[in-house]
């Protein structure tokens, strides 16, 4: 049996302000830093250790991983940074307040943009300052692979090559893997691992800073999964994530 640990970054400044963040590189809040540190303490106290880590190229996930490594005394851990683990790109919604957007377009439309599987928000213009084309962290990524908006289906399509080519082989070789990423890149992995339907994935919410453990068989099929920590607090955090896109 193999174990895989997934962690969504701690609360970011734009999580706190209820904004669509996507590929915008915002940092953690004080609470977010604390959540990440607590995740590291919890993992260490629960007897976990790791051989390799994966994260995105966005600082809120990178810093979350740093805190986990620090609290586990694993600062030497090899780390793979990949744009493929970035948050889903929210296109022209990037930076907008979720409740204000819901008041303008309606709760139902915003829920479709946030949570449907295959409906992306309106795209950025290629000349928009928020477009990834001139960002040095994507200099080696072919332009045609860089999104101007994404739905979850698009996010799954870009995450899976990293899973198939790097993460899954690492797990099968016996390496203990931790992934510090984002709500939607983790939803993409969970959808794939648990074979969740396009309709049911709409209801899946990933809380900030809580380790999600997958126990996998020899074919990397899930045996079971569970969050580490206070289960009542985790359920409240998931409900709060679900509520973010509503006008009220």
Curated annotation (Swiss-Prot):
PROSITE patterns: PG_MUTASE. Its EC number is 5.4.2.11. The keyword Membrane does not apply. One of its GO terms (molecular function) is phosphoglycerate mutase activity. One of its GO terms (biological process) is gluconeogenesis. Substrate binds at residues 8-15, 21-22, 60, 87-90, 98, 114-115, 183-184. Homodimer. This is 2,3-bisphosphoglycerate-dependent phosphoglycerate mutase. It comes from Paraburkholderia phytofirmans (strain DSM 17436 / LMG 22146 / PsJN). The gene is gpmA.
């Amino acid at each position: 049996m193999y174990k895989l640990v997934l962690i969504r970054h701690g609360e970011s400044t734009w999580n706190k302000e209820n904004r669509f963040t996507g590929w915008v590189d915002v940092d953690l809040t004080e609470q977010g830093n604390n959540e990440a540190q607590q995740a590291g303490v919890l993992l260490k106290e629960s007897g976990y250790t790791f051989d390799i880590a994966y994260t995105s190229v966005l600082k809120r996930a990178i810093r979350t991983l740093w805190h986990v490594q620090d609290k586990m005394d694993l600062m030497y851990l090899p780390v793979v940074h990949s744009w493929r683990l970035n948050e889903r790109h929210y296109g022209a919604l990037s930076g907008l307040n979720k409740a204000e957007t819901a008041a303008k377009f309606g709760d139902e439309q915003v829920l479709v943009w946030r949570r449907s599987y295959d409906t992306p928000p309106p795209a950025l213009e290629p000349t928009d300052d928020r477009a990834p084309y001139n960002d040095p962290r994507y200099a080696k990524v072919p332009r045609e692979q860089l999104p101007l908006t994404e739905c979850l289906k698009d996010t799954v399509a870009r995450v899976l090559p990293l899973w198939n080519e790097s993460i899954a082989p690492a797990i099968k070789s016996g390496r203990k893997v931790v992934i510090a990423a984002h709500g939607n890149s983790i939803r993409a992995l969970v959808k794939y691992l648990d074979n969740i339907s396009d309709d049911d994935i709409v209801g899946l919410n990933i809380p900030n800073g809580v380790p999600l453990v997958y126990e996998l068989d020899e074919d990397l099929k899930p045996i079971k999964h569970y969050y580490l920590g206070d289960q009542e607090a985790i359920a409240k955090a998931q409900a709060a994530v679900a509520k973010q896109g509503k006008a009220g």
